[in-house]
């Protein structure tokens, strides 16, 4: 919407969100499958036949829940209070489970933090990990991605913006969310130290420590609580991510593509069922693709690496998202060039090495580059070396994205609609109110707008929305009266809740 409500930009951003979310959902599938394998002492979690694969059934269940909770209504901005309450509850469950586990391991299996860390000091692996934790490029890259992910991940944006019902909620989240993260971080080092101490032989993967530790202590209740906490966390994250991405894909790609088909009946009376059906099919497709991604590289990549891969993809939205709020000069072409360049480098420098590690692509490409061209090696693209290979890919992709966004925006001009939208987003409230008071000479009536909206949302919902608008504005809306520019803009925003800003326009 900020960059002129362009269909091509909306479609490309939706594709970036889809591809970037696939590793994120695959991460949750692997986490659940790994947890189940630890509980059942199964050593092979990724090469099982389809109908014997735990992750396959987890994907089916999560797809069903996402369809059930996220596609009951066509209005994308209608708040899913039940879904948000469920996510809030699972957040408390996983925090309770993690804190209980940390306390039990620290004071139940060991004699406190001092005893635990003293025993762990003799472990060479822990010494190596701690020795590497300086304030170098890798740490700054991970911290940057973590900050950007809280805003740019589709599920984060959906919960923070779309599902936000009160402005004061954002003020509360400013201090409550950091406290929540600090509570989780408190026992991270003790649990890692306990795992390295008890499983010094390396026969247990670090990803499985949280379940392996209570199992080693023969604590059935804590093992079950930890598994429930992890499963509930994965379920909540997958459902919200799938719903958010399905809305983007259906609104910006599927529905516009259907409207362009010659055989598609554009005069149909009710598009509401079509929109819901498109979203439900999209949710199933997203979970299927995430499962395929999990099968492709899940066995060869750690949970943390998969998560950071998704964070880096979502970070490509940051220049356009943050710049669009504070810099009026930023335009559509700058976003398109910047995101294309940044996403291409992400795919080449971060996704390709993961696929090479999974034996999907030739191993010699990692150091020697495709066709033996060394400066095309994904871990040192263009001969640049910024920290490790992950830091190199993150910094290069974000840096090129930001540079292209600023440079192209500076050397190209904005369209009229872009200048108007920039003022709406950047300027003060007073400027917003005066910038849209331009003349309207169309012959469209209020009744015409209602008929259009009823195709997608139904007569009852449309009537209620227009009545609410008339009550707020203090102006009666008669079906036969000519629609003002304010009513036109209200209708566009109303349709955007179903079709997205670009399609509604």
What positions do the PLM features span?
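Membrane-embedded helix-loop-helix hairpins and adjacent transmembrane boundary segments
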Residues: 1-483
């Amino acid at each position: 919407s900020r960059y002129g409500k362009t269909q091509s930009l909306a479609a490309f951003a939706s594709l970036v969100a889809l591809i970037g979310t696939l590793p994120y959902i695959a991460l949750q599938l692997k986490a659940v499958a790994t947890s189940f394998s630890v509980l059942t002492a199964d050593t092979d979690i990724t090469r099982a036949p389809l109908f014997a694969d735990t992750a396959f059934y987890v994907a089916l269940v999560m797809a069903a829940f996402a369809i059930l909770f996220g596609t009951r209504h066509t209005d994308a901005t209608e708040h899913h209070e039940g879904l948000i309450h469920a996510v809030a509850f699972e957040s408390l469950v996983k925090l309770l489970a993690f804190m209980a586990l940390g306390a039990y391991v620290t004071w139940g299996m060991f004699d406190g933090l001092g005893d635990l860390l003293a025993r762990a000091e003799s472990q060479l692996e822990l010494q190596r990990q701690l020795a590497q934790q300086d304030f170098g490029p890798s740490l700054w890259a991970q911290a940057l991605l973590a900050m950007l992910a809280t805003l740019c991940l589709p599920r984060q944006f959906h919960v923070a913006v779309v599902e936000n019902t009160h402005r004061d909620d954002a003020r509360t989240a400013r201090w409550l969310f950091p406290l929540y993260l600090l509570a989780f971080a408190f026992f991270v080092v003790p649990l890692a130290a306990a795992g390295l101490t008890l499983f010094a032989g390396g026969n247990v993967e670090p990803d499985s420590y949280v379940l392996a530790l209570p199992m080693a202590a023969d604590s059935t209740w804590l093992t079950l609580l930890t598994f429930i906490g992890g499963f509930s966390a994965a379920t909540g994250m997958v459902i919200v991510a799938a719903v958010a991405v399905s809305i983007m894909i259906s609104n910006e790609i599927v529905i516009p593509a259907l409207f362009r088909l010659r055989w598609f009946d554009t005069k149909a009376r009710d598009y509401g069922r079509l929109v819901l059906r498109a979203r439900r099919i999209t949710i199933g497709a997203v979970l299927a693709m995430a499962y395929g991604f999990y099968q492709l590289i899940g066995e060869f990549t750690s949970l943390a690496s998969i998560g950071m891969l998704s964070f880096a993809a979502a970070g490509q939205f940051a220049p356009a998202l943050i710049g669009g709020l504070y810099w009026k000069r930023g335009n559509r072409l700058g976003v398109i060039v910047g995101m294309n360049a940044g996403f291409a480098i992400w795919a080449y420098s971060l996704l390709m090495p993961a696929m090479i590690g999974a034996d999907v692509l030739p191993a010699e490409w990692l150091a020697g580059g495709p066709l033996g061209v060394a400066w095309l090696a994904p871990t040192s693209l263009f001969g640049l070396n910024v920290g490790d290979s992950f830091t190199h890919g993150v910094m290069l992709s974000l840096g090129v994205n930001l540079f292209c966004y600023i440079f192209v925006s500076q050397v190209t001009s904005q369209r009229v609609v872009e200048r108007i939208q920039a003022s709406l987003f950047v300027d003060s409230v007073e400027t917003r109110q005066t910038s849209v008071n331009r003349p309207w000479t169309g012959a469209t009536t209020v009744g015409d707008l209602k008929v259009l909206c009823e195709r997608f949302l139904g007569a009852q919902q449309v009537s209620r929305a227009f009545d609410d608008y008339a009550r707020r504005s203090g102006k009666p809306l008669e079906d036969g009266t000519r629609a003002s520019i304010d009513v036109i803009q209200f209708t566009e925003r109303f349709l955007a809740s179903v079709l997205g800003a670009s399609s509604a326009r």
